[in-house]
């Protein structure tokens, strides 16, 4: 393909500022199977036509800059530029529109979520011609998906490792999150696992503080795991948070966890960064460790409706970077989410092929070509009375993570864990018998209470 007309040698270089839409707005463009497609919610400054703003987003997130430069003539912009190929209004929002942008695959390094985000969202969000900008969704082409390892193991391999089938997995975040000594922390882990939980969890900000250094915590938690396994006959785990200040230190902690023989480690993937996360994910696959992912800091990025990035994009990025679990919201509890929207990105985490469905916030059909799935984790503000709804909404392939809903039991940690396990098994049994969890959930839990703490 030839460069732009303005930069052909026969015409000569012409300096100056020109409208973005002359080069980057191409409504006639037919997207390719290899293009990365993006849907941006754009709120422009007053008086700026949508075509110009959509083209500006495409330009500033690909090959463009604020003026014409002579080096444009040394490459083919038609081959490498991003293109705004469609614009549609946002219902009920007169000042907003959705700009669809296609990016050629050659703009991105293979297997690098870091590079993908640096290109697409790294600079354009500070563009002063826009009042606000939000990345709503991405379509990752099959050709790019195949350059990623994805989750270290995936849903089926995890179930096989744990020998647990036919129900959601149960977890608990140890509280108080900060201040416990390593020995007392390990005691709480043991009580919860002995009571019937599958996992316990470090909170996201438990790393290696003066009151509890990481090595001590790992040792006491491993002791709790082995002791509870011996008593219950079930495989247990604790999400040992390997997040650290450097990648080298993070891997050192993961290596120690592997040497202890525990099944799973944890990473804060947004604060730790995608490069660190992908590094840890590769280590976990090579060494048989499951990887639990916490999304600490996500609300800084995804909470605003008009600016930032929707969590479904972060969820897709995590599936590419690698993680076997990720916190996904609850739909119920203290951090309630929109049910259809939440289930939309839950499906993007678990399923192999997801059709476009705007009612669930899915802007593009996504084919993961057998990339392993990720278990969504429902957590924060949930308790046993939410169990029927959680079982119905999330299904078997999920982790139900209780903190205060376990440790807040008036009889202590172990009875709290027993109550969680009894409630879950009662709901699963009732569902399998054909009972309606939505209408009979309260009755099912009350029946289970007769034989449970």
Curated annotation (Swiss-Prot):
GO annotation, biological process: photorespiration; reductive pentose-phosphate cycle
GO cellular component: chloroplast
Cofactor(s), names only, from the UniProt record: Mg(2+)
UniProt cofactor note: Binds 1 Mg(2+) ion per subunit.
Residue numbers bearing the N6-carboxylysine modification: 201
Protein residues bound to substrate: 123, 173, 177, 295, 327, 379
Residues cleaved off as propeptide: 1-2
Keyword Ribosomal protein: no
Coiled-coil spans in chain: none
Binding site for Mg(2+): 201, 203-204
E.C. designation(s): 4.1.1.39
Further comment found in the protein's record: The basic functional RuBisCO is composed of a large chain homodimer in a 'head-to-tail' conformation. In form I RuBisCO this homodimer is arranged in a barrel-like tetramer with the small subunits forming a tetrameric 'cap' on each end of the 'barrel'.
Family membership noted in the UniProt record: Belongs to the RuBisCO large chain family. Type I subfamily.
Purpose: RuBisCO catalyzes two reactions: the carboxylation of D-ribulose 1,5-bisphosphate, the primary event in carbon dioxide fixation, as well as the oxidative fragmentation of the pentose substrate in the photorespiration process. Both reactions occur simultaneously and in competition at the same active site.
Name of this chain's protein: Ribulose bisphosphate carboxylase large chain
Protein's organism: Galium parisiense
Organism classification: Eukaryota, Viridiplantae, Streptophyta, Embryophyta, Tracheophyta
Gene name for this UniProt entry: rbcL
């Amino acid at each position: 393909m030839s460069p732009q007309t303005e930069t052909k040698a026969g015409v000569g270089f012409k300096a100056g500022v020109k409208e973005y839409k002359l080069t980057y707005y191409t409504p006639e463009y037919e997207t390719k199977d290899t293009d990365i497609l993006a849907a941006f919610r754009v709120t422009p400054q007053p008086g700026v036509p949508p075509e110009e703003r959509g083209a500006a987003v495409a330009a500033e997130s690909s090959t463009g800059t604020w003026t014409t430069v002579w080096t444009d003539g040394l490459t083919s912009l038609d081959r490498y530029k991003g293109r705004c190929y469609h614009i549609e209004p946002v219902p009920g929002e007169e000042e907003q529109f959705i700009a669809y942008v296609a990016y050629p695959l050659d703009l991105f390094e293979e297997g690098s979520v870091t590079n993908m985000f640096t290109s697409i969202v790294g600079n354009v969000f500070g563009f002063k011609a826009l009042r606000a900008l939000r990345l709503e969704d991405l379509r990752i082409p099959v050709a790019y998906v195949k350059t990623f390892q994805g989750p270290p193991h995936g849903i089926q391999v995890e179930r096989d490792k744990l020998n647990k089938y036919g129900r959601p997995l149960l977890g608990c975040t140890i509280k108080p999150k900060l201040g416990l000594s390593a020995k007392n922390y390990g005691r709480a882990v043991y009580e919860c696992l002995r009571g019937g939980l599958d996992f316990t969890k470090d909170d996201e900000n438990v790393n290696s503080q003066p009151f509890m250094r990481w090595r001590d915590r790992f040792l006491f938690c491993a002791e709790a795991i082995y002791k509870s396994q011996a008593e219950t006959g079930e495989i247990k785990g604790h999400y040992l948070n390997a997040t650290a200040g450097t990648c080298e230190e993070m891997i050192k902690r993961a290596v120690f966890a592997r040497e202890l023989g525990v099944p799973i480690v944890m990473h804060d993937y947004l604060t730790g960064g995608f490069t660190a996360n992908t590094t840890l994910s590769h280590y976990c696959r090579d060494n048989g460790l499951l990887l639990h992912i916490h999304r600490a800091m996500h609300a800084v990025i995804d909470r605003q409706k008009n600016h930032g990035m929707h969590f479904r994009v972060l969820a897709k990025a995590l599936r590419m970077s690698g993680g076997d679990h990720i916190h996904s919201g609850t739909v119920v509890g203290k951090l309630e989410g929109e049910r259809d929207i939440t289930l939309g990105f839950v499906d993007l985490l678990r399923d192999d092929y997801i059709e476009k469905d705007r009612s669930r916030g899915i802007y593009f059909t996504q084919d993961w070509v057998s990339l392993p799935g990720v278990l969504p984790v429902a957590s924060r503000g949930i308790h046993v009375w939410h169990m029927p709804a959680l079982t119905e909404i999330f299904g078997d392939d999920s982790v139900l993570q209780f903190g205060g809903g376990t440790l807040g039991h008036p009889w202590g940690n172990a009875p709290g864990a027993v109550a969680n396990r009894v409630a879950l098994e009662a709901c699963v049994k009732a569902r399998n018998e054909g009972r309606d969890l939505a209408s009979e959930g309260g009755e099912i839990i009350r029946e289970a209470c007769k034989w449970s703490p």
